């Protein structure tokens, strides 16, 4: 398979060091506070139907404001920083504040897949992709972030027959299992595989 070959080539290049470093940054969240985890959750809420770069920029600008700013002020900041859906995202972030102890909550579950179900059910603005993104970014390995880049790569390499317009829970888990199989073939965890495929599609290693 062409995708396997491309990933193996990247694993033997300097990109591997960049990806390994990024994974270590994610793992360092195990030693961070509830507040830092909450800010990362807000980043993942922001990136839905937006860009990762835009989310990173806004996260840096707002910082602790995710925890403290009144909704109207947060809305205004998101608008000025160029977020397309500033009203909705401000609403979701303010509603999510009842889970400010998000690290404690997530770590109370037996594994990341159980934690993901909780996040999807309880936090407005968080679907399977966003929940997986958050969990990967705070150091968990066994969840896949299935976005358009990943879907296109799978489609172009004949792992899926079509690019679904929407992803039901069943479809999400089905595609996640395909990615898990690919990961096993190239000896990568889902958290790592995502960064390799993202690099293949975009030439970037983000978060």
Swiss-Prot record:
Q: Which residues form the active site?
A: 129, 147
UniProt keyword DNA damage, yes or no: yes
Matching SMART domains: ENDO3c
Extract one GO BP annotation from the record.
base-excision repair
* Family, per entry: Belongs to the type-2 OGG1 family.
Q: Which SUPFAM superfamilies match?
A: DNA-glycosylase
Q: Where do transmembrane segments lie in this chain?
A: none
What organism is this sequence from?
Methanocaldococcus jannaschii (strain ATCC 43067 / DSM 2661 / JAL-1 / JCM 10045 / NBRC 100440) (Methanococcus jannaschii)
Protein known as: 8-oxoguanine DNA glycosylase/AP lyase
Q: Site positions for Important for guanine/8-oxoguanine distinction, renumbered to this chain?
A: 207
